[in-house]
Amino acid sequence: MIRVILTDIEGTTSSISFVHDVLFPYASEHLPEFIRANHHTLPAVAEQLVRVAEISGTDRKDIDGLINVLQEWIAEDRKEGALKALQGMVWEQGYHSGELKGHIYPDAADYLKRWHDRGLRLFVYSSGSVKAQKLIFGHSNEGDFTVFFSGYFDTAVGGKKESQSYRNILAELGVDAGTVLFLSDVEEELRAAEEAGLKTAWLVREGELPDTARVVARDFSEVDALLRKR
């Protein structure tokens, strides 16, 4: 019986275009100014710039060089933790100022509430930082959804296409793998979760449905129908 739902964000609860067409451009535009204004005064910014310098081989004192590296990583959609942390700081400013609103599909908003009210525990697992996850759900077009989630996971537990990452999550949650349903729009992530023993549902919101033995759903209402059968 499913007792825990672990969900991805991009393409699952939220539009991929929101991340790529809104969040990434916003970070790319505002990151240089943010770093120049805060690299001396905010320890959290300085700490992440040290990591960027170590990974890229750039001189820590070369602020313009570090900014260029970060812009390249944004363009490449790199999953570097330092980039995600800095993006999260920039997005936080945007959310608090009201310039940004997180996106949640109406069906996802509806069923996340229903599942929470039915006693299911809800968790997020995304390549975006935990801070960024909380911002998307805390300042969304559907209101504050952080009240419905019991916790958040990012790449600190490992990459989403690695089965060990899901074992790490299970260890933190202290639950049996068979009681967890993982929702994602990426087949490689589903495969990794299945290798760790989790149940899965493949969200395919647009385009043709794949020819697969995996459980496939168009939206969260179809996921709910599957839940009621289990």
Swiss-Prot record:
Relay the cofactor remark from the entry.
Answer: Binds 1 Mg(2+) ion per subunit.
Please provide the record's keywords in A-Z order. Answer: Amino-acid biosynthesis, Hydrolase, Magnesium, Metal-binding, Methionine biosynthesis
Question: EC no.?
Answer: 3.1.3.77
One Pfam family linked to the record: Hydrolase
Task: Look up the record and name the pathway of this protein.
Answer: Amino-acid biosynthesis; L-methionine biosynthesis via salvage pathway; L-methionine from S-methyl-5-thio-alpha-D-ribose 1-phosphate: step 3/6; Amino-acid biosynthesis; L-methionine biosynthesis via salvage pathway; L-methionine from S-methyl-5-thio-alpha-D-ribose 1-phosphate: step 4/6
Looking up InterPro entries in the UniProt record yields: Enolase-ppase_E1 (IPR023943), HAD-like_sf (IPR036412), HAD-SF_hydro_IA (IPR006439), HAD_sf (IPR023214)
Q: Which reaction does it catalyse?
A: 5-methylsulfanyl-2,3-dioxopentyl phosphate + H2O = 1,2-dihydroxy-5-(methylsulfanyl)pent-1-en-3-one + phosphate
Q: Which domain of life is it from?
A: Bacteria
Q: Name one GO molecular function term.
A: 2-hydroxy-3-keto-5-methylthiopentenyl-1-phosphate phosphatase activity
BP-aspect Gene Ontology terms: L-methionine salvage from methylthioadenosine
Query: What's the cofactor?
Result: Mg(2+)
SUPFAM superfamilies recorded: HAD-like
Give the family per the record.
Answer: Belongs to the HAD-like hydrolase superfamily. MasA/MtnC family.
The annotated subunit structure for this chain is:
Monomer.
Spell out the PANTHER family in the cross-references: ENOLASE-PHOSPHATASE E1 (PTHR20371:SF1)
What is the documented function of this protein?
Answer: Bifunctional enzyme that catalyzes the enolization of 2,3-diketo-5-methylthiopentyl-1-phosphate (DK-MTP-1-P) into the intermediate 2-hydroxy-3-keto-5-methylthiopentenyl-1-phosphate (HK-MTPenyl-1-P), which is then dephosphorylated to form the acireductone 1,2-dihydroxy-3-keto-5-methylthiopentene (DHK-MTPene).
Task: Fetch the HAMAP family from UniProt.
Answer: Salvage_MtnC (MF_01681)
**Which named protein is this?**
Enolase-phosphatase E1
Species: Marinobacter nauticus (strain ATCC 700491 / DSM 11845 / VT8) (Marinobacter aquaeolei)
Q: Which gene encodes it?
A: mtnC
